[in-house]
Regions:
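Sequence/structural signature of outer-membrane beta-barrel proteins
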Residues: 49-53, 75, 92-98, 132-140, ...
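Residue-level signature of outer-membrane beta-barrel architecture
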Residues: 70-72, 113-115, 159-161, 201
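Cleavable N-terminal export/targeting peptides
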Residues: 1-35
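Transmembrane beta-barrel strands of outer-membrane/channel proteins
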Residues: 40-50, 87-93, 126-132, 171-175
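Membrane-embedded beta-strands of outer-membrane beta-barrel proteins
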Residues: 66-68, 107-111, 126, 155-157, ...
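Outer-membrane beta-barrel "beta-signal"
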Residues: 64-66, 190-203
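Short loop/turn motifs that connect adjacent beta-strands in outer-membrane beta-barrel proteins
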Residues: 22-39, 72-85, 99, 116-123, ...
Length: 203
């Protein structure tokens, strides 16, 4: 009887170990599948920018961006690089409150990376892109932009706060460069810095 009991015990132990191993494997798979950020986002962002780095005159510009972001890669790791990439395109409308010109309209395309840590509602990010647009230039005024057509460079860094599964709030710092890349002489480019806030809807 003892050999039979020992045999039955070994079989039961083997079955239990297989069952628990299966559960552990399923939990591991589920944990890896859990990080699946939304594929598409729309954001409305605004900022207030100040001229810096030897501006031709004192500039203060309001910035309004309507942005679509598309996820194109997820970094699934336990380290600080855990996160995802996004391609974005922004429509830009900027009233110039203080400066020679009065407005700037354009677009910008680029990339954004979001650092997502487990169990945190705060998501640090940085982004950068290039684009073009039009400004109501006054080339006859010293220090003004030399022509209407102007290139732009944007870079930003900040933090998103996850409100719920669909909505996020963003706060950060923004840099913008406006220039016609030497198509006129002189070419008094603009360098602008300032705070930025926004709201994002994901789906």
């Amino acid at each position: 009887m003892k050999p039979l009991r020992m045999c039955i015990g070994c079989v039961a132990l083997s079955i239990c170990s297989q069952m628990f191993a299966g559960v552990e494997s399923q939990v591991s798979v589920a944990a890896s599948d859990e990080f699946n950020p939304h594929r598409i986002e729309f954001a409305l962002e605004t900022g207030y920018l100040f001229g810096a780095i030897n501006p031709p005159t004192d500039y203060q510009i309001g910035a309004l961006f309507l942005t679509e972001r598309i996820r194109w890669g997820v970094v699934r790791t336990d380290g600080w690089l855990r996160g995802y990439n996004q391609f974005y395109i922004s429509a830009i409308a900027e009233p110039i409150f203080k400066g020679i010109e009065n407005y700037y309209f354009g677009f910008n395309v680029g990339f954004r990376y979001n650092f997502v840590q487990q169990h945190s509602r705060f998501i640090p990010y940085f982004s950068g892109g290039v684009g073009a647009g039009g400004i109501d230039s006054h080339p006859e005024v010293p220090g003004a932009q030399g022509q209407d057509f102007t290139f732009n460079i944007l870079s930003a860094a900040g933090i998103s706060y996850i409100v719920n599964d669909d909505w996020k709030l963003d706060v950060g710092a923004l840099y913008q460069h406006l220039s016609n890349r030497g198509q006129t002489d002189p070419n008094p480019s603009l360098n602008l810095f300032g705070p930025q806030v926004g709201v994002t809807y994901s789906f």
